[in-house]
Each structure stands twice: as C-alpha cells, then as structure tokens.
Amino acid sequence: MNKKVVIGMSGGVDSSVAAYLLKEQGYDVIGVTMKLTPDDAFYTEQEGGCCSLSAVEDARRVAYRIGIPFYVVNFTDIFKEKVIDYFTEEYLNGKTPNPCIACNKYIKFDALLKKAESLGADYIATGHYCRIVEENGRYVIRKSEDEKKDQTYVMYNMTQDQLKHTLMPCGDYKKDRIREIAREIGLNVFDKKDSEEICFIPDNDHGGFIKRECPKAVKTGNFVDKEGKVLGKHKGIIYYTIGQRKGLGIATGKRVFVTNIDAMKNQVVIGEEEEIFENELISFKNNFIPFDKLTEPMEVDAKIRYNAKASKATIYPVDDENVKVKFEKPQRAITKGQSVVFYDGDLLVGGGIIK
C-alpha cells in the first residue's frame, strides 16, 4: 500500500512541483492550503497574500492538473495566537521577531502534522528548500542543493518526530530546475514570482499593521543618546529596528543609527555606527537537531538573520535555558527577537532567539 502524504500548498511554484514530485515517487498525495488569516477585508483583498483567493485558486488548479485531491484547512485561531499576536507583542516590546519561524514551529510542523495524522497520513510535505536525511539513527537537516534559495534558517525548531514525518523534495533541486519542471508539466504557476514579504502583511508595512492591531499601544516617545540626552521625538518604537538609519526623521548633522530600543521607557537610543557592532550575544528557546543538548563549547558558523552571511563563532552552554555565542569578528546590528542559527558546514546544528 502506498504511503499517504499531506502537502501544504501555497499556490506557488515550489509546493506545486513538490506535490508533483511526490506523486511521481509513488505517494498518495493530498493537497491542502492552510487558511491562516481572519475573514477580514484587509487580508482577503491583499492580492497574492498567503490566504488570498488567487493563492487558493492557484493551488486548487495545480492539484486538479496533477490529479490529487485538494482541501482548505482552517488554522486561523492558532495562527492568530501563535504568530500574529506574538509578532505584535514582540514589536511592542522593542524586539524584531521572525514570524516564519513561529509559523513553522506551531503551524506547519505541528498543527498541520497533527491534522495529517488524524487523516491517516504517514507524512506531511512542504515546498521548502532543505534536505532531511537520516544519519546514524538520527534525522538531521542539511542545506539544499540551491544554496541561494536555502531555507534551513527557519527550520531549527524541528523535533526528531517532526523530521521523521516530513518530506521536502525541493531540497534536492535548484530553483531553476523546479521552474523548468513546472513548465514541462503545464503548470501555470511556473513563472509566479517568489513571495518575499511576511504573508500576513503583503504591503510590508509592519508599523501600519501593528498600529491597526493595537492602536492604543503605539505611543510617541523620545530619541535619546546613550547618556539619555533627549534628541527628538519618535513616532512609536514599532517603527524602528537595531541598525536602522533611514526614516528616523531627526536632524543631528551626522549619520546616526538606532543602537537600542528601550520599551520600558518608550525610548529609541541612537548613536554612531560603531555602536551597533558587537561580538557576542545570548540566545534562549534553543533547539538542537543532531543532538538533544549542547553540553560543551562548539565551533560553528552562525547567522544572526535570514539574509545574513554566516560568521565563525563558538557557542557555549550557559544553563538549561541559555547559550552564549561569541563571534570571531564583531557583527553588525545584532537584534533582539531575531533568531541566531548555527551550522557545521551544510549541517543545521540548531538555533535560538536573541535576548
């Protein structure tokens, strides 16, 4: 009997081709699109967003074309709680979160997996560019064949059980080849552009989104220097992030950057560029994939944000909750709330959230 797999389909080229590849490999494939955002005009009218009508229809058409059943599953409540509310609260606390990491942890590889298991499926699948491999009796994640498109950074929270029941067929291909396959089999999405914005904020206006969600929580405050001297007024801490230079709306006669955000005092600290370079950080909510726990110092390559270049570092266990990361060279704009992710060559070691 064929193994059954439920694949999350966004209407994009990657998940569409992933569904086709799995069917070709002999799996019984069921396509699902996850409804994540509320029934609200702001979300439903945003063309191209993850839950737009066009995305659902693209996924439905692909499923019909490749001959697999298709359903829409509703995860709006848990997505609101675990992703949208988390994103909003972190910004209001002066941090800069990565909602894709929260979505993967709680929605794609938890809620969707549980839903798939309830349908009697053996696996879930996605169109992510990662390779899941079993080595020495343990599941690990390695970078994809296409390093430019590699998405392992957002996968560091995965557990052994999740990895055991997850397939990511695109990880063995270059993106160009995925598009070629889509064209060869007659999928209209073969040239659909990649989505780069946060799925629930298609206009990319983070501040505007948070103000809409929590209008009373966004308050003006002071720009200050590191000594606390007031330099001007800011429009609300949600509009700023560490390392930001543009859009500050303050004239100081020199180039200045956001060096810290103090949510308790509702202050944005600004200073010289050299003040945004640091060579160590502490991470918490850490997860490791090749082993359960970090017990001794380890040399790694570490990334402090999705698009950052990995830099040489040593990670040290501090206690059950925290890991210290010491970089060989100072890093620009280490940002609270972002994730730091560790690699050993192409092996994803793990990661955590920057304190």
Swiss-Prot record:
It is an enzyme of class 2 (transferase). Disulfide bonds join C103-C199. InterPro entries: MnmA-like, MnmA-like_C, MnmA-like_central, MnmA-like_central_sf, Rossmann-like_a/b/a_fold. ATP binds at G8, M9, S10, G11, G12, V13, D14, S15, M34, G127. Residues 149-151, 305-306 are annotated as: Interaction with tRNA. It holds the Pfam family tRNA_Me_trans_C. The record marks H128, Q338 as: Interaction with tRNA. The active site is at C103 (nucleophile), C199 (cysteine persulfide intermediate). Keywords: ATP-binding, Cytoplasm, Disulfide bond, Nucleotide-binding, RNA-binding, Transferase, tRNA processing, tRNA-binding. It is found in: Cytoplasm. It comes from the Bacteria. GO terms for biological process: tRNA wobble position uridine thiolation. GO terms for cellular component: cytoplasm. It catalyses: S-sulfanyl-L-cysteinyl-[protein] + uridine(34) in tRNA + AH2 + ATP = 2-thiouridine(34) in tRNA + L-cysteinyl-[protein] + A + AMP + diphosphate + H(+). Its main location: cytoplasm. Coiled coil: none annotated. One of its GO terms (molecular function) is ATP binding. Its EC number is 2.8.1.13. Catalyzes the 2-thiolation of uridine at the wobble position (U34) of tRNA, leading to the formation of s(2)U34. Belongs to the MnmA/TRMU family. This is tRNA-specific 2-thiouridylase MnmA.
